[in-house]
Amino acid sequence: SGLTFTWVIRGDNVNVSSGRLGTLDLDPGESRTLIFNLSSIRPKPGVEYFLTIQVKTKYKKPLIPKGHLVAWEQFKLPIYRKPIITNPSELSAINLFKNDKGVEIYGQGFKAIFSRESGQLSQYSVDGIDLIKSPAEAHLWRAPTDNDLGNGMPERTALWKYAGSRMKTKILYGSLKNNTAEIIIINLDSLSSTTLTSTYHVYGNGAIKVKQKIEIEDSLHSEMPRFGMKFDMPSSFKKVEWFGRGPQESYWDRKTSAAIGHYSGSVWDQSYRYVRPQETGNKTDIRWMALSNGKVGLMAKGLPTFDGSVHQYPYSDLDHVPKSQKHGKLDIKPKDHVDWLIDYKQMGVGGDNSWGAKPHNHYLLNSDKYEYSFMFIPFEGGEDLNKLSKLKLD
């Protein structure tokens, strides 16, 4: 055989075990069962373990170098040990204050404010450093792709483009129990008959657990392009790390080519500048993602996972402008701005054809109820982010 078969088992992207497979002399259509002994692996709390098999060329050939990756596959192993739970009562004390403008939470070295006007987290700072620049907002739109334009998505789903900014706060409730502040905010967009319930839990270490639940009452509405949140981050937060699929962009219906692992890079490099500006840079099955400036940062830990992207420009720069000459290489440039999109999902990109076909129905966010959760964890430069991601508060 002109191929070599290797395997590796990783936990938190650290090699636990590895080896080579013998020659697999199989005819087309034949199969063979491989057995891996996992008894020597001692799982650590909260760590996922993956087996990755790679097939590479053994010899150099015309047009194909030696060691060229021909095929690979990844398997999540049935090895898991639950993370250690931290009791919120063991953390530093926090205080909750209510006023006409909303609810304010103060703890040791941090502050979180939830305003009636925005209906979301509006201020979040640690040691005097703002971790978000403006109030969070519900984000239900995506910049149309070429496939979207071909199937009329901008017109069909126009109802959702500004649904997040149209929402009005109906209820804002705050309470303090077991050294945990709970804030429940109910927002309503009457035009789309949509209710968004946001539940925040704030802890004494500055972590904030976020749960977003959306309910669409009218079943006749078009699919929703995306369900998520958008955060305007400090412009100095130009470094991103994540544990999820990568390193390239991936989507709900386009993700099996992206392996789960630990990746890092600049925020700017996560965008691909297509000739016509459009949706770009999405990552799927994210266990955690962190933005930082090297000195301080913010992690979003999925509960259990989320999709998302980061952009060194306003995400709206990618939006379609009919009859415009906007060019991705010329007009999409890095700015003094970082947008962080943390999503439940966005609809698939489709591609059966580009002149009318929508994404398959099971990759659409049709009128229904959807919810997802994640937890913000502030950190300082140099912290072990894999270790930090194992924090579990209950």
Segments (PLM) and residue ranges:
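Beta-strand/loop-rich accessory regions of lumenal/periplasmic or secreted enzymes
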Residues: 11, 25, 37-46, 61, ...
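Local beta-strand/beta-hairpin segments that build beta-sheet-rich folds
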Residues: 16, 65-72, 131
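Short beta-strand and strand-turn-strand segments in soluble, beta-rich domains
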Residues: 2-3, 9-21, 69, 192-194, ...
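Intrinsically disordered, low-complexity Pro/Gly/Ser/Thr-rich segments with frequent PxxP/GP/PP motifs
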Residues: 5-64
